């Protein structure tokens, strides 16, 4: 079966594993998924991410993060720009998620960035997802 939106698939796998409080999950790897996972790690939404070589496309193993009382760190994920309806934001229109409590992930000419990084670099791009 052909996967039409691999980023949405990754976000759905994270959302599903998070809902049942799994410790880790695996997704087929790609460069953009790897960069999104690194942003989630850097922003404190996941504990760790590792790349596993399997002589094909590779696998990303994502370790989810929970609070001291087993509460979820990721409360929501939403795919914004989809293959059927792309959503772009200019440099001065980069969205804020929950007044800065969450992050927006953008694909820009300078790589995959968070909304804060895009504002600092004064660049716009395709709004991939919101995470809060």
From Swiss-Prot:
What the entry lists under InterPro entries is as follows: Ribosomal_uS8, Ribosomal_uS8_CS, Ribosomal_uS8_sf
Give any Pfam family that matches. Answer: Ribosomal_S8
- Keywords of this protein's UniProt record, alphabetized? Ribonucleoprotein, Ribosomal protein, RNA-binding, rRNA-binding
Q: Which PROSITE patterns match?
A: RIBOSOMAL_S8
Annotated family:
Belongs to the universal ribosomal protein uS8 family.
- Please tell me the species this chain comes from: Anoxybacillus flavithermus (strain DSM 21510 / WK1)
Subunit field text: Part of the 30S ribosomal subunit. Contacts proteins S5 and S12.
Among the GO biological process terms of this entry, one is:
translation
Has keyword Glycosyltransferase? no
User: HAMAP family per the record?
Assistant: Ribosomal_uS8_B (MF_01302_B)
Which GO molecular function entries does the Swiss-Prot or TrEMBL record give? rRNA binding; structural constituent of ribosome
User: What name does UniProt use for this protein?
Assistant: Small ribosomal subunit protein uS8
User: What task does this protein carry out?
Assistant: One of the primary rRNA binding proteins, it binds directly to 16S rRNA central domain where it helps coordinate assembly of the platform of the 30S subunit.
Entry annotated with the keyword RNA-binding: yes
Cellular component GO terms held in the UniProt record: ribonucleoprotein complex; ribosome
């Amino acid at each position: 079966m052909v996967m039409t939106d691999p980023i949405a698939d990754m976000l759905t796998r994270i959302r599903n594993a998070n809902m049942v409080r799994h410790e880790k999950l695996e997704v087929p790897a790609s460069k953009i998924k790897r960069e999104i996972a690194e942003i989630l790690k850097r922003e404190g939404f996941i504990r760790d991410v590792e790349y596993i070589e399997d002589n094909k496309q590779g696998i990303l193993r994502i370790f989810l993060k929970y609070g001291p009382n087993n509460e979820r760190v990721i409360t929501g994920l939403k795919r914004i720009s989809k293959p059927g309806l792309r959503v772009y934001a200019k440099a001065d229109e980069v969205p804020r998620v929950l007044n800065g409590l969450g992050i927006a992930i953008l694909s820009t000419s300078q790589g995959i960035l968070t909304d804060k990084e895009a504002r600092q670099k004064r660049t716009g791009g395709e709004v991939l997802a919101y995470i809060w």
